[in-house]
Amino acid sequence: MGAITIGGAFLLLSLAASAQASTTEVTANGNAFTGGLSFMPASINVRVGDTVRWRNTDFLVPHTATEDHGLWDLGGSYGGTPANPPGFGPGTTVQRVFEAGTQAYYCRVHPRQMHGTIRVPVSLSIGRKRVRVRVRHRRPHHRRYRIKIRRYVVVVWSSTRPAAGLGFDVERRQAGGRWRVVRTATTGTRLRFRIVRRNRVWQLRARLRRSGSATAASGWSPLASIRS
């Protein structure tokens, strides 16, 4: 029994109302003289494609926002000394669009005092495709077709391709089962897999990693689940 896609269209049915990407601001505070060195809030949860913006609230010193493994580094040219690196200066901002993962970061100017975490789950939805399926007929030269809806789980872990030298790892499992690798160091941003059986709970996670390194990676994203 063959299958033919009708119109080539893939219809995406989001389980939740779609929302525009948003921006979350984190303040980078304080200096070594007056104290108060911190990122506030130190831990945030955002969605794939959201922007995190850091604002330097201090009047004197630079700050940076740097992923623990150097996967990304938001700094600047202000305030460098022989003892300290430069960063983004008082009153200025830096920002980044985020992919799925649990990303720990710190300030390179104040590495002991300033740390933060950004948690981003993968985005999951149900998609469907209309296909024309050939039905067997007793007379070989008579072809009959019927329309069938095929359902898919659609997984999105990033809104953009990663920077050069980076890639994404993606794993899935049925609830309670073993994790299975579905992508390794990919530069792609999404996938879909066909739903063969209904009423199954699928769980997925992803992370950002330096290609060629097993350890230079963000943490896995918070668990995301969907019922097929």
Model-derived segments and spans:
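Bacterial N-terminal signal peptides that target proteins for export
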Residues: 1-6
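Intrinsically disordered, low-complexity repeat segments enriched in small/polar residues
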Residues: 7-9, 26-27, 187
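C-terminal segment of classical bacterial N-terminal signal peptides
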Residues: 9-19
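Short hotspots in intrinsically disordered terminal tails
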Residues: 16, 113, 225-226
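N-terminal low-complexity, intrinsically disordered patches enriched in charged
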Residues: 16-18, 50, 215
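Extracytoplasmic copper-binding redox domains, predominantly the cupredoxin/blue-copper superfamily
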Residues: 20-151, 176
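Low-complexity, Ser/Thr/Pro-rich intrinsically disordered linker/stalk segments at domain junctions
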Residues: 122-228
